[in-house]
From Swiss-Prot:
InterPro entries: P-loop_NTPase (IPR027417). One of its GO terms (biological process) is symbiont-mediated suppression of host innate immune response. Belongs to the thymidylate kinase family. 5-hmdU DNA kinase subfamily. This is 5-hmdU DNA kinase. Gene3D superfamilies: P-loop containing nucleotide triphosphate hydrolases. It catalyses: 5-hydroxymethyl-dUMP in DNA + ATP = 5-phosphomethyl-dUMP in DNA + ADP + H(+).
Amino acid sequence: MAKQRVINIRGTSGSGKSTLIRRLVELYPEKEPVHVPDRKQPLFYKLRGDGLLPLSLLGHYETACGGCDTIPSMDRIYELVRERLAEGDSVLYEGLLISAEVNRAVALHTDGFDLTVVRLNTPLELCVDSVNQRRWAKNPDKPGVNPKNTEAKFKQTLATCKKLDAAGIPVVEADRDGAFHAIKQLLEA
């Protein structure tokens, strides 16, 4: 049996988390959306491909922003991580809200799961620009975002990754392309 991995991508708004996920999904020829009652969009996707770990990708990606930000609570996200691991899959998950979480990630690590955190080190100015581009694609008349919110999340993500590293969890810091290659290597069976 292939080794199971848990891979958590972290970054502020506009850092490229969802875009990175979409790029990683393309590695897998088999993509099965898993729906649950009372939820329009998939709760997660089962991804399969030769030479790659069987993978559950949490959340949905039917909109510009996706991932765990589409799951109602932090408790449900981490229940789902553990459920998918119990089923034999590796797990890939990301989201803005999850980027600030520490305790549940440390609990996964303490319980012996092979967790790797990948922090996107996209420059703050590029993150703000990406958020504005996404915003203006929906409504060109909207004003730009207040960069203070993005900056606060940027700092918070950096601080939480330092805590995870101090807890013994491997934290890989990379730009968008470097993160793709690091995660691709982790997913190779």
